[in-house]
Each structure stands twice: as structure tokens, then as C-alpha cells.
Amino acid sequence: QMPILSLFNLIIAASGTCGYGQEAAKKYNLNHLGSLVLKSTTLHPRQGNPRPRVCETSAGWLNANGLQNVGITAATNEKIPWLRKNYPQLPIIASAAGFSEDEYVKVVSEFANTAGVKAIELNVSCPNVKHGGMAMGTDPEVLQRLVKQVVKAALGIPIYVKLTPNVTNIVPLAQAAEQGGANGLTMINTLTGLSIDLKTRRPALANVTGGLSGPAIKPLALRMIHQV
């Protein structure tokens, strides 16, 4: 049970890991999931960062995809209808990203008017883009204002705010999201990290830094959840 959202089970595929579901469905029965969080989607399509974008570390993975996605039009007209047709019982959680308050509101509004979307995750914590993303999720005042506008655009659909761990204190951001009207929080996004290719003596990722995920960040995530 999540705030205003009932699931078959609590196994949820996190945003990004399964794209929009089509690729993952070739290897895995999506009906076994409690829900699928779609890849974070922006107003316009994005090619993402230069390659290589992903590398393995000793305790997880670094990625710097740079919000590569098909854009809101393709997501709502093609990707979500495919999921609804092939997995009609699977609750879909969309993920909205943007580079301004106006973009976030437009993306959320489109998702809110798309059949099959049961909740919307607000990604204000992507560490792999130059503007927007994490920049809007590190200032409590800015975040609270953004969440208020997004909640209005969501037309009653639950909003879960994905918080960045790349701050000194995550608690004020969680409070700002709550005060803005968020129904819940997603904790946490990846931690900014860097890996060196020992053969080339250069960063393993073309973007230099990337977001660290995997076993290494679980204790940090649990600590932040406890703080909140």
C-alpha cells in the first residue's frame, strides 16, 4: 500500500531500469511487478549524453544517460498505450522531468490526461544534466513552489517527489515537497560519482561523472529515509 495507490505487491521497477517496458518485457513477465515506473520523460525528446554512459564499479554502476527519452508525445501516444494493451492489470507510474517549472507542469498535465497512469513521479534529482533536474530539487523554496504547481496540474493523480541525495541535508527538501502537496517521496536518486579507466587513465564515462546506484548506496538511502 502506497499513499493513495494500492498495488498487487511492493516490487516496483525503478524509473530508467526498464525504459518504457517494451525492452524489459522480452526478458521478464511484467505482470509479476507491483508497478512499473516509466523512464523519466521530458517535454521534448532527448538524445542524452555522449557514450560511454554506463560503467560497472566494485559495488554498483555509474550511469550518465542524461535523461535520454522519447518525449511526452511519444510516451503518451505510443509507449503507454502499448503497456495498457499488453499488461492491462499493471499499474503505471509515469516519471516527469524538465528544465523549468513550465516544462514540468506541461509534462505532468499530459501524463494526468493519459489513460492508465495511476501516479506520477516528479524527478527533480537527475545528476547528469547541466540545467534543471537536480538544480530544481536542491532549493526547498523552489521545490515547494514547483510541487504546488505540479499538484494542480495532476488533477488528483498522486505525486511522488524523487529527492536527490547530493545535498548536505535532505530533510528540508522532504519537508518542502510535503508542504507543496506531494503524496509521497521517492528516496533516493543516485549519488554523483566518478570512475577511472586504469588503461586510459581517464574517466570511464564520457560525461566524466555519473550517478552511482547499486549495493553501495543502500545504507546511505536507509539513513536518509530514517532522517526524514
What spans do the regions from the language model cover?
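Generic structural signal for well-ordered alpha-helices
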Residues: 72, 76-81, 104-112, 140-151, ...
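Non-catalytic positions within long, well-ordered alpha-helices that form the structural scaffold/packing
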Residues: 28-29, 112-113, 178-181
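Active-site glycine- and acidic-residue-rich loops that bind
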Residues: 16-21, 95-107, 158-184
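Structural preference for beta-strand elements that scaffold enzyme active sites
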Residues: 10-12, 35, 91-95, 117-121, ...
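Metal-dependent enolase-superfamily TIM-barrel catalytic cores that perform enediolate-based chemistry
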Residues: 109-153, 161-164
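Glycine/Thr-rich beta-alpha phosphate-binding loop at enzyme active sites
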Residues: 61, 69, 127-139, 173-176, ...
